[in-house]
Amino acid sequence: MDFETFPCPLPRFKGEFPYIQSPFEFSLHIESNPGSCDLEKDNIVFLAKTTKDEREDLVKELLKYINPNKGTLFAQNVSFEKGRIKELASIFPEYKEDLLKIYNRGFDLLWLLNNNKELYEELGFTGKDLETFNFYDERLSGSFSIKKTLPVFSDLSYDNLDVHNGTEAIVVYANYDNYSKEEREKQQEALKIYCRQDTWAMVEILNALRKLVK
């Protein structure tokens, strides 16, 4: 899962505070069986069509496709996604129960690469094994961000996209009202492709890790 958010200096909508990471888009790649996920068929993207408040529509769409009672919510740096889910649960109490169930099912892809002592203690590891990386490559240069991690495991690239990173996504969303109808539609499609790329990148990394441990 991946959110794209807009950190506005001034609160725009109900329940917000300055610089809150207000979600306007998400992408999901749904893996029903291990290793079985298609770039397009198993992808869900929600994107706000305007700069008006579409957060409740986003929540409804999220709950339409994520079963709060089973499965695992994967993200890279899952604390960010969990933070947005928790904020939405506070803003929309009518969806709080299901949103918090999803919140509690969050699992960080980084835990498989970097480390998570609590997780590995539960799995029976002790001592020095809890202090070491599970995986490292010099190309990471000390960073486990998705942009650094992806090239280690896949030739998937952001270079050919019209939107290349989260900052550019914010700029496109913030300029909705400055575009012509045709340009807005073009830019919105670019946002969808970019957000989809983020979650597909996680699928690629996860599948590569599966191959490593076989």
Language-model features: locations:
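Conserved RNase H-like, two-metal-ion catalytic cores of nucleic-acid enzymes
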Residues: 1-66
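Acidic active-site catalytic centers that drive phospho-/nucleotidyl reactions
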Residues: 2-4, 108, 198
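Active-site proximal loops enriched in glycine and acidic residues that flank catalytic Cys/His/Asp
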Residues: 3-5, 9, 30-32, 76-78, ...
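Hydrophobic alpha-helical membrane-insertion segments
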Residues: 11-13, 117, 207
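Active-site lining segments that contact anionic ligands and/or coordinate catalytic metals
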Residues: 23-25, 104, 188
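A generic secondary-structure signal for well-formed alpha-helical elements
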Residues: 30-32, 89-92, 153, 209-213
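Conserved DEDDh/DEDDy metal-dependent 3′-5′ exonuclease domain
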Residues: 42-166
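Acidic, Mg2+-coordinating catalytic module of metal-dependent nucleases/exonucleases
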Residues: 133-214
